């Protein structure tokens, strides 16, 4: 990962200065410095909005930034941190896409004022042992396939909340289980931040925007569209009841043999059991080669006529 040439400096009191300043964008790597900056902004009457990311930014992240920037009287912080604690030992941490300079350029284009880009040993210094337990939901769906993933995710999000102290934080709805767990953590731990879910940004053919789409070759990219098509089929089947929703989605997925489907599940919006009538969420996970893809959509389940 290429970093800007202006490295972190310190004043005579040992306080960390910004590591990078250009065109109105300031990049901080030190948590204490960023905390002081956001505290001063709140003291001056501004609100702080946060967009947590792992970098490799795309148009889905761009929409998160725009939503954050739309809050009147606010200053937006975008975090760029590939969090090792949410990757399993056989997962793609080492090859996860990293494009630091391009990420900064997108932040500048969207008028973001602050970027937080810490090093791993800053976030997890020697002796760090604390983690957030996601509870039973953390072992279901994505958690069943990726043990420890949600504990690592919640831990870093909790740290980002403590460092940035945002008034509002924005997360994409594509990672619906992540969003549900973050909302539950905020509720259970009385964290004073408003969590906003932003609808999934899609390609023109329906594929959900994702940093991991970069792993797909041209053939896989075409095959991946079956996931969003399956979600659409499930939505149309909502008026026939919950079982029909799942069956319709599975039928579409079965038409694409390259997809190794992990799960197709209909749940309540907070990921409890699926309702027989009302709002629900259809969630799909599948692999194309070595790439794991997830997506979800709202479904309105109604009574059979």
Residue map of PLM features:
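Nucleotidyltransferase catalytic core that binds NTPs
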Residues: 3, 8-259, 266-267, 290, ...
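A conserved acidic, glycine/proline-rich C-terminal tail/linker
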Residues: 260-275, 284
């Amino acid at each position: 990962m290429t970093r800007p040439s202006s490295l972190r400096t310190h004043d005579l009191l040992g306080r960390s200065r910004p590591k990078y300043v250009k065109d109105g964008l300031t990049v901080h790597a030190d948590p204490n410095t960023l905390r002081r900056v956001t505290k001063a902004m709140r003291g001056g009457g501004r609100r702080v909005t946060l967009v947590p990311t792992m970098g490799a930014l795309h148009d889905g992240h761009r929409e998160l930034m725009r939503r954050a920037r739309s809050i009147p009287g606010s200053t937006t912080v975008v975090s760029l941190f590939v969090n090792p604690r949410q990757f399993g030992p056989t997962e793609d941490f080492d090859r996860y896409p990293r494009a630091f300079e391009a990420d900064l350029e997108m932040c500048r284009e969207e008028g973001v004022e602050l970027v937080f880009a810490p090093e791993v040993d800053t976030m997890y210094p020697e002796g760090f042992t604390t983690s957030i337990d996601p509870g039973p939901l953390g072992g279901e769906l994505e958690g069943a396939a990726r043990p420890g993933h949600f504990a690592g995710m919640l831990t870093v999000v909790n740290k980002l909340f403590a460092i940035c102290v945002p008034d509002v934080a924005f997360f994409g709805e594509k990672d619906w289980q992540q969003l549900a767990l973050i909302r539950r953590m905020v509720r259970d731990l009385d964290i004073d931040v408003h969590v906003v879910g932003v609808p999934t940004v899609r390609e023109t053919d329906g594929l959900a925007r994702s940093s991991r789409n970069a792993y797909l070759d041209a053939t896989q990219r075409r095959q991946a569209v079956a996931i969003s098509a399956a979600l659409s089929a499930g939505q149309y089947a909502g008026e026939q009841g919950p079982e029909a929703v799942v069956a319709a989605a599975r039928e579409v997925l079965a038409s694409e043999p390259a997809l190794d489907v992990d799960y197709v599940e209909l749940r309540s919006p907070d990921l409890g059991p699926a309702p027989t009538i009302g709002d629900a969420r259809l969630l799909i996970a599948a692999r194309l080669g070595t790439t794991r893809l997830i997506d979800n959509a709202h479904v309105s389940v109604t009574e059979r006529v």
